[in-house]
């Protein structure tokens, strides 16, 4: 069945151009990974063994991805073979070419021994001063950083089961299920029987404790944080899994665990298979950020079970995941909550697009060899992608019609890596009786156009009071002159009665100066009003332990030019490495005082993960 012409004319091969490997020539039947963590030397010694089977005509070479790893030897079926490390090609690293004399058998074992170096972008080493007291190491492999841990087929198109053994003087946690006897003699053993791409592998080692969260979930973190983490997430995971399994095929990954990383972790969460790595910033001490856990859990189907075949189709990972996250939270908290989250997400996408200096924000991107996949990640994949799926749901007959497709898609095609065109083939085939409706969708704008997607409508029942309050503040900021006038006009109890998500929308609206980003309101011209707002809502905003509130409060203070807040803000920038929070604050600070932003970054740069460090450096225009 052919797709409409607007789609067929753009159909492209699934080839991943972000890898230097010849992954299409081989199937990886199993991967055995032996790691040794050396904290004193800040090195990870690795021996990775791939069970490879040729997929077509015989090839004479294996090409693997590497980046800043020190190679020791390569073996094919236990015998050393010649290899060549070719000149580095930014941003993809150095191609490792393995050419055994006499060629390659149809099926063979390929073993690579290597050591990480100080330039490995996958690994962050933390000293005791950066943790609760003991050294710690963790990896972040998405999107193309696994190649700086071990030589590999570093592409989401290549999947295999894994067995991982880690020798470490401190407890280690890896993607997968920990095996009986793990930890004996300092060797930690994990099995991942479900095939995954290597970027979904993860390693952490340090002073790590463990507590149960439910019948099929545990939390790992430093002992000092264990009570808070168990309190935040205990009892929640099973409830989330039950709701997910109502919508999706059963969860196949064994336990669903959480690893709470040190504060330098660059993301809110990472869907490491079976054990999501999350930032401690998720702990709000009132469970108000736990939707992020639902998001990472939803990746167990979208991203981990069905994976984008290359990074130009990243929305198949993230757009689906946001859609599923909101379906699950809607089932738990009501449809109005789902609608509100969609509205909030679309508003944040519009702000991001306006602040992007001309970035594409197309849903399907052309990620060539010269493009770092890290740099094409944007809210478009998340929000535009989820909005497209919501649009499909509505156009095809609502959840009653769309839900059978969800189970069909993840049930029948689980384990595969797909492109947008393969997804569309599946969609058009399943809804063959509704082809006319599918053909009426503006696919060109949704998939390929830059900027905002076609506008959808959302219920505003949870947003109306928020917008009203924000507009009142903007109106009174112009009219009133004295702090006591604001105190008489506004009550702190109103904002306190809002949910955290509503408080976030309030702050977003206040920061941008109105419901629409098209405005000219300048908070620096209204210092009394800005100070009064923080005073009236001191109990809600000033005492919040939720990082989503804290970082927006700092953003507001910078927007309002409140220089007395700068010392607190610059100190806070050294306390967290979550890019969602620190990058906007650095950018805002740089727009006001570039020298202060640069000096603050230089003070804290070694606290950040290499991925975060490079991103901030680029944001600030520093070499």
Curated annotation (Swiss-Prot):
GO terms for cellular component: cytosol; fungal-type vacuole lumen; multivesicular body; nucleus; NVT complex. It is found in: Cytoplasm; Nucleus. It comes from the Eukaryota. Its EC number is 3.4.11.-, 3.3.2.10. Pfam families: Leuk-A4-hydro_C, Peptidase_M1, Peptidase_M1_N. Keywords: Cytoplasm, Hydrolase, Metal-binding, Metalloprotease, Nucleus, Protease, Zinc. PROSITE patterns: ZINC_PROTEASE. The active site is at residues 296, 382. Its cofactor is Zn(2+). GO terms for biological process: cytoplasm to vacuole targeting by the NVT pathway; lipid metabolic process; peptide catabolic process; protein catabolic process; proteolysis. Zn(2+) binds at residues 295, 299, 318. Belongs to the peptidase M1 family. Aminopeptidase that preferentially cleaves di- and tripeptides. Also has low epoxide hydrolase activity (in vitro). Can hydrolyze the epoxide leukotriene LTA(4) but it forms preferentially 5,6-dihydroxy-7,9,11,14-eicosatetraenoic acid rather than the cytokine leukotriene B(4) as the product compared to the homologous mammalian enzyme (in vitro). This is Leucine aminopeptidase 2.
